[in-house]
């Protein structure tokens, strides 16, 4: 047993540890969130408050009091959503820990007076549960303290505040107030057997008898009063449909929850069904009747409505319910239950009749009772009046000036002799302070004022003398006869006689007083003589009246500051507006001048006047105005135009822009004169940008006048000035593409002007003062051409399927000069359309006849500054070149998209073009210049130069190839020493040797002299390849040797004798250097090799027979030169060198006998 107990204790301690840890974790989180609340944004604050509410009130309610102040402090946050979240937190607090009600109820009362209607509605929604939970909590207290009493007082205050909100201006606040009052009525009433039962229901039966804060009877009376207010509100004629439906629903709920009120609710529904508010529209009437039908059906299901079933059934029939539907709604009851309810109905009716009869008797008895003057009440009124008068007099008697004035005023009225009454009542003034004397005199005078019912104390007296029921002594009746004393009878008769005499006397006095009053009334009814104004006044001169008028208006105008300080500036503005709109012209012009003196600060007054003139023009106002012979809109137009001109003349540039824009955008109507003035303003250089933007905004914001403003922009889009044209076209694009305003009209105008270009000379419609071209011109100018197609080109990217076709038609039919103008203007629209435009790609693919130049220009534009052209574009251009357009220029823009083989195939055709085009081609191929530096080619500069050397001269002129190679070699940044070495290395491997190889070698030596050793090696390799068999190359070989002498002399010694003889014959200047070199070689040991005697003889010039293998002297014609097929495996050989497959390689002839003794070239030993 002990082990079990110990284990239980252990489990409890462990649970406490986990609970403490959970609480500590939650506290840490909430502390962090509260710290973040200080600097967080409103949305973040709401999220953090929701987290705090979920953590504190959801799982760790013991932390609620600790962090309550941190959350409640946000009730003063400027953001509405944050304050609503605080209300939600307070509502949840009152549900979870209602004992914290005294701490939060002040915040609820404060937020109920919030400036935001949304916050007020949320507070009213929360007050429903707060009031219910608070009422239950206060009822559960055995000994409520001061905090509980204060909480109940504030709850009562909140209840009163929400009750006042039933007449609030906001519809939503009224609806929420109705729902709250519904809950109050249910809470403050008793439930019975037919009441609808709900979980957590509360009624007056749950209020304990010992509760000292409130009593059942008081709460019940208050609930009944609130129900009466709801019923009264439900029957008002000005109620809105939303409030009416909400009030109907609330009354239905009250009747279901508290059937005791069923009769009043059914009667209210009956009145509503018979008399719907006249302010409702047809749709609202339908909604109200539908809601009323639904609520009546709900009531009929309740057992408490058995007594009123016939009334409800009649209303439902009137609202469209069938008999079967109604019968299904009536709850099922057995016969005993129905009999019991019928009996209760009869008892209630009998009690009602009895009560009505009892009330009628009491009312009749009350009327028959004899009344007498209530002297006690009259004395109390006199005392209260004396106190009020005494206080009033004491305050004034403390002022010496008032006392002195009073004495001096009444001193002459004193009698010559002292009245006897004064002597009787006078008491000598003892030694009293001034304050005591003032009190004494004030009391004395106050009593006199009260006697005469004068002074401020007269308000304490009731209008009628206070009366009370006269008490009559009960006389016991006896069955025995009483003896009557004759003296007593006589005494009684004398008293009765005196009473009659007094009554007669009073009646006579009353009649005399009534007669006097009647005389006064008759005199008052006599009509006084009316005096006519013309009889007693003299008319003022006209000029004087006008001066008085203008002075009065000027004083009103000059009181601007005083009216602002006094808070009546709006009333002053309204007064000035009416005066300006209805008074003669001199007043109008004076007010206009006053406005224009400081138009920036008085623009609101100008707008008020403008709208007043508009109201007069449209007949919206009851004010009259001075009739004139002008048109009805003259005053409005004159005011608007003067305002516009005044702003333009008197304001600086910045204010002018702002105010002109406000006037045109806010004016109720814009006459044609004002629009024309805006057009003239837009011609000003400083205002053109803002003016055209304003015209565009007017076209958007004033739909009835959009045709006029679009027409203005169209005129500006073909204006002679370029800046106006560009601005207008940009705004037309916005209207055309973004706002979709009159796109058909804009298309029509643009195409009409585009077709002007097809004519031989500019038509007359192009020239007008509105377009800035008043003088007609006989011939087309470039500027005029651009004006005609400018708008069409601007709209081309937004509707290419229409404009591109029209532009193509115009391009085909126009002259060459205009075609060039069109081609130069295509850049911007084509770039906006982009390479992925299907319309452009289709045009490139189709390329109608006569459109080749236009298509090529479009391709150029689409490939500008693009690293690699679009694949689809390259494909279309390739197909175009192969199938339709044989002009190689079409391939130039897409060079960077071609493959290596395609580039080599088109290169011979490209270099045959004019020099300017060839220069551009090589700029593209080599990436020269900023325009082409970003392009990537399939061939390197080395490959390009090698490909140029391998071009077949039968296909391309040698001069074109020479120019092309010169263009390449001129780019020293690209063709460096290393690049040229690579080029020459590849060229020497080509068979047959390229014709221009030695020329390129010589140019390379000229550019880079340090290539001499490399060139020497090339020359040796050329001897091996029998360079003398190609005449042009042989000549270049010899020129290279000449440039490299004397270093090149050993190269000559490696030539066969016949070629050495030929070299010395062609270049005699080589002989001395060669002789010198040979002599130097003779002085050295032979070391196994040397110069033969035959060579020495050739060098010395002696006659030596040299045998040549053929009659050509060793030269082979180009058509018989052996060409080796390239081997792809060799890197040094370019795979793209064209091979003449038609030629069969010739066998190399064996060397002659004399050549066998010649030394081999270096490296061939």
UniProtKB/Swiss-Prot annotation:
It is found in: Nucleus. One of its GO terms (cellular component) is nucleus. One of its GO terms (biological process) is co-transcriptional mRNA 3'-end processing, cleavage and polyadenylation pathway. HEAT repeats lie at residues 23-58, 61-95, 98-140, 147-186, 218-257. Disruption phenotype: RNAi-mediated knockdown results in overproliferation of testicular cystocytes undergoing transit amplification leading to increased incidence of spermatogonial tumors. Belongs to the Symplekin family. The HEAT repeats have been determined based on 3D-structure analysis and are not detected by sequence-based prediction programs. Component of a protein complex required for cotranscriptional processing of 3'-ends of polyadenylated and histone pre-mRNA. Involved in germline stem cell transit amplification, differentiation and mitosis-to-meiosis transition. This is Symplekin. It comes from Drosophila melanogaster (Fruit fly). The lineage of its organism: Eukaryota, Metazoa, Ecdysozoa, Arthropoda, Hexapoda.
């Amino acid at each position: 047993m002990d082990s079990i107990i110990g284990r239980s204790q252990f489990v409890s301690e462990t649970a406490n540890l986990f609970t403490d840890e959970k609480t500590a974790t939650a506290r840490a989180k909430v502390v962090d969130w509260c710290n973040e609340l200080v600097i967080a944004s409103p949305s973040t604050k709401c999220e953090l408050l929701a987290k705090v509410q979920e953590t504190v009130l959801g799982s760790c309610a013991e932390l609620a009091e600790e962090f309550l102040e941190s959350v409640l402090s946000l009730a003063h946050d400027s953001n509405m959503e944050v304050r609503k979240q605080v209300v939600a937190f307070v509502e949840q607090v009152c549900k979870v820990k209602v004992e914290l009600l005294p701490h939060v109820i002040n915040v609820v009362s404060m937020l109920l007076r919030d400036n935001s209607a949304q916050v007020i509605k949320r507070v009213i929604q929360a007050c429903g549960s707060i009031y219910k939970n608070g009422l239950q909590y206060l009822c559960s207290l055995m000994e409520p303290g001061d905090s509980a009493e204060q909480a109940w007082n504030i709850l009562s205050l909140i209840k009163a505040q929400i009750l006042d909100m039933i007449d609030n201006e906001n519809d939503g606040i009224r609806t929420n107030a109705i729902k709250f009052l519904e809950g109050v009525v249910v809470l403050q009433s008793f439930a019975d057997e037919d009441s609808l039962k709900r979980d957590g229901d509360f009624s007056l039966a749950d209020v304990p008898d010992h509760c000292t804060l409130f009593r059942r009877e008081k709460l019940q009376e208050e609930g009944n009063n609130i129900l009466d207010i709801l019923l009264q509100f439900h029957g008002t004629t000005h109620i809105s449909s939303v409030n009416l439906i909400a009030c109907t629903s609330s009354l239905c709920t009250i009747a279901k929850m508290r059937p005791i009120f069923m009769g009043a609710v059914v009667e209210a529904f009956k009145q509503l069904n018979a008399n719907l508010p006249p302010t409702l529209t047809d749709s609202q009437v339908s909604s109200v009747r539908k809601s009323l039908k639904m609520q009546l059906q709900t009531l009929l299901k309740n057992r408490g409505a058995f007594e009123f079933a016939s009334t409800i059934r009649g209303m439902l029939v009137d609202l469209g319910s069938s008999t079967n539907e109604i019968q299904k709604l009536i709850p099922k009851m057995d016969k005993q239950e129905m009999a019991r309810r019928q009996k209760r109905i009869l008892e209630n009716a009998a009690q009602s009749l009895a009560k009505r009869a009892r009330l009628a008797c009491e009312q009749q008895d009350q009327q028959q009772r004899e009344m007498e003057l209530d002297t006690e009440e009259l004395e109390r009124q006199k005392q209260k009046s004396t106190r009020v008068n005494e206080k009033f007099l004491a305050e004034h008697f403390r002022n010496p000036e008032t006392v002195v004035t009073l004495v001096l005023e009444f001193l002459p009225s004193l009698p010559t002799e002292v009245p006897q009454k004064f002597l009787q009542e006078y008491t000598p003034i003892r030694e009293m302070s001034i304050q005591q004397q003032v009190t004494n005199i004030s009391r004395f005078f106050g009593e006199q004022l009260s006697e005469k019912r004068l002074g401020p104390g007269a308000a304490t007296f009731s209008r009628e003398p206070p009366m009370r029921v006269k008490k009559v002594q009960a006389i016991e009746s006896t069955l025995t006869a009483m003896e009557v004393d004759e003296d007593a009878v006589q005494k009684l008769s004398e008293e009765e006689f005196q009473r009659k005499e007094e009554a007669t006397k009073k009646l006579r006095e009353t009649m005399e007083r009534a007669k006097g009053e009647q005389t006064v009334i008759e005199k008052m009814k006599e009509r006084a003589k009316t005096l006519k104004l013309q009889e007693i006044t003299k008319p003022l001169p006209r000029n004087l009246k006008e001066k008085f008028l203008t002075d009065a208006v000027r004083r009103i105008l000059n009181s601007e500051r005083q009216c602002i300080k006094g808070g009546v500036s709006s009333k002053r503005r309204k007064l000035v507006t009416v005066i300006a709109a209805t008074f003669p012209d001199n007043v109008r012009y004076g007010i206009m001048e006053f406005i224009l003196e400081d138009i920036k600060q008085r623009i609101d007054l100008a707008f008020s006047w403008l709208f007043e003139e508009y109201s007069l023009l449209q007949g919206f106002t009851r004010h009259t105005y001075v009739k004139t012979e002008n048109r009805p809109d003259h005053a409005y137009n004159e005011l608007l135009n003067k305002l516009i001109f005044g702003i333009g003349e008197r304001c600086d540039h910045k204010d002018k822009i702002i105010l002109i824009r406000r006037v045109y955008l806010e004016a109720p109507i814009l006459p044609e004169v004002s629009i024309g003035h805006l057009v003239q303003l837009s011609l000003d250089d400083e205002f053109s940008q803002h003016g055209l933007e304003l015209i565009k905004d007017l076209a958007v914001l004033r739909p009835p006048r959009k045709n006029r403003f679009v027409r203005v922009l169209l005129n500006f889009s073909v204006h002679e000035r370029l800046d106006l044209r560009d601005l207008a076209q940009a705004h037309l694009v916005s209207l055309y593409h973004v706002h979709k305003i009159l796109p058909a009209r804009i298309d029509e105008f643009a195409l009409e002007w585009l077709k002007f270009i097809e004519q031989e000379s500019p038509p007359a419609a192009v020239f007008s003062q509105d377009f800035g071209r008043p003088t007609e011109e006989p011939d087309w100018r470039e500027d005029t051409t651009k004006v005609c197609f400018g708008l069409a080109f601007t709209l081309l990217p937004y509707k290419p399927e229409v404009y591109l076709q029209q532009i193509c038609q115009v391009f085909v039919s126009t002259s060459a000069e205009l075609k060039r103008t069109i081609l130069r203007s295509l850049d911007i629209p084509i770039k906006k359309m982009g390479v992925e435009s299907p319309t452009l790609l289709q045009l490139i693919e189709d390329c109608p006849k006569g459109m080749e130049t236009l298509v090529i220009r479009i391709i150029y534009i689409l490939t500008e500054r693009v690293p690699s052209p679009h694949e689809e574009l390259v494909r279309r251009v390739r197909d175009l070149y192969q199938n339709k357009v044989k002009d190689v220029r079409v391939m130039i823009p897409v060079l960077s998209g071609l493959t290596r083989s395609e580039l080599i195939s088109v290169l011979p055709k490209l270099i045959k073009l004019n020099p300017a085009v060839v220069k551009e081609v090589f700029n593209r191929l080599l990436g020269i210049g900023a325009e082409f530096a970003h392009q990537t080619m399939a061939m390197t500069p080395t490959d390009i130069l090698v490909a140029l050397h391998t071009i077949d001269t039968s296909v391309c002129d040698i001069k074109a190839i020479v120019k092309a190679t010169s263009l390449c070699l001129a780019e020293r940044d690209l063709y460096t020493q290393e690049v040229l070495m690579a080029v020459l290395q590849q060229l020497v491997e080509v068979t047959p040797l390229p014709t221009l190889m030695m020329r390129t070698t010589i140019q390379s030596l000229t550019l880079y002299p340090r290539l001499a050793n490399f060139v020497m090696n090339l020359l040796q390799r050329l001897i091996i390849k029998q360079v003398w068999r190609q005449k042009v190359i042989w000549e270049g070989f010899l020129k290279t040797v000449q440039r490299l002498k004397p270093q090149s002399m050993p190269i000559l010694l490696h030539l066969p004798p016949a070629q050495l003889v030929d070299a010395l014959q062609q270049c005699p200047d080589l002989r001395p250097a060669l002789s010198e070199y040979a002599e130097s070689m003779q002085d050295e040991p032979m070391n196994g090799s040397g110069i033969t005697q035959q060579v020495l003889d050739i060098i010395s010039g002696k006659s030596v027979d040299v045998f040549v293998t053929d009659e050509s002297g060793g030269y082979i014609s180009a058509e018989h030169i052996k060409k080796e097929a390239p081997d792809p495996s060799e890197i040094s050989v370019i795979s793209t060198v064209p091979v003449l497959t038609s030629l069969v390689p010739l066998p190399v002839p064996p060397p002659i006998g004399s050549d066998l003794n010649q030394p081999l070239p270096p490296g061939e030993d």
